[in-house]
Amino acid sequence: MIPANTFPALGNSFFPQETLLMGAGPVPQPPSVKQANTHIASHLGQRMNEVVEQLKAMARYAFQTTTPWVFGLSGPGSAAAEMAIGNLVHRRSRVLAISSGHFGLRMCEMARRHQAKVVLFEFDGREAFPLDRLRALLEQQVFDVVTLVHGETSSTTLNPDLPKIAALCKKQRALVVVDTVCTLGTTEVLMDNWQLDVVFCGGQKGLSSIPGVSLIAFSNEAWERVVQRTFTPTQWCYDALLAKGFWHHHRYHYTAPVNGIFALHEALRLLNEETLPLRIQRHRQSSQGVQKVLLQFGLTLAAPLPTRLDAVVGFQLPVWLSSVALIDHLLSQHQVEISASFGSPLLRIGQMGEQCRAANVLRLVTALGESLDALGHPVDLVGALKTVSAQYGHRELLQYD
């Protein structure tokens, strides 16, 4: 018999002090979301039915859509991308994959694995989107599905021309599939107004919920395409017609992630309570404070306005300063974590959900300033703290412990 293992419990010795997550996700969770995640119940029955219906209503507000076709699913935002593509794309599909980084390429790869005829349209996300180049391509070729990312976290760039891109694609009745994993709840996303057909996100970023439970919404046009499809999706768990059984008829599909659904419900409740305009304003205000501090510290921001992503702020260090050393110093000396970026020289600071609270930003700035100074890059930490404090109102600063 193979012997049993005797690992210790993951208690205080493994988590001596909770790390402040200020990277590209996951992000800190509000206490009420943490509490909701401790509850367990049957995934079927009246109580879960009520939770699911409320969750869908609150998700419609987050997506800014009236479509009935809203679903949750087990898995990260990439699983939601799989669900979107797997229900709309097959061997004969013509797919245009618009990409400015890692996650745009990921959807391109997903479509290729479904043996679609894929055209990759790459552009530099730091620059204005080449609408004329897209217009010329759409005049030459017809596509069934267009995939793109609203906020590309790998390059920390925003695509502010998303509404114009969608309008061009809709002229030839292509379905527009959009990754809003980091922008939902942090940046304006208007699914119906922008004519988006499928929009998805993970729970662990702008919504400040737990990883592993995601959201997806299909427009009526996209759902009609799902219903009329002539193929069977290769992934059983992410078949939208099967998922409809649980999310719309309260029938068994697979054992739903009950704790995660409760956590996501609470995260969406908090968003609805705060309202989108106030939440987006809070994110913009906090992110701008972080951006100002990075510039005061003599660091280089990765993207210019208006393509700079507020939700995940990218920056570069002087060439002589090791990004690995900075990440390690922040974590070992201050229990603050920021992110690298897929092997590029970029470092990333998250400004999503609970990351955009005065207490968390002030702790981040203090840790970053002290770490830079310790690594031989002196900074004006007092001035930086004054700068970021000016971004917050007096009431929120009083909450800083």
Where are these regions (language model features)?
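N-terminal glycine-rich, Lys/His-bearing helix-loop that initiates the first secondary-structure elements
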Residues: M1-T38, R395-D401
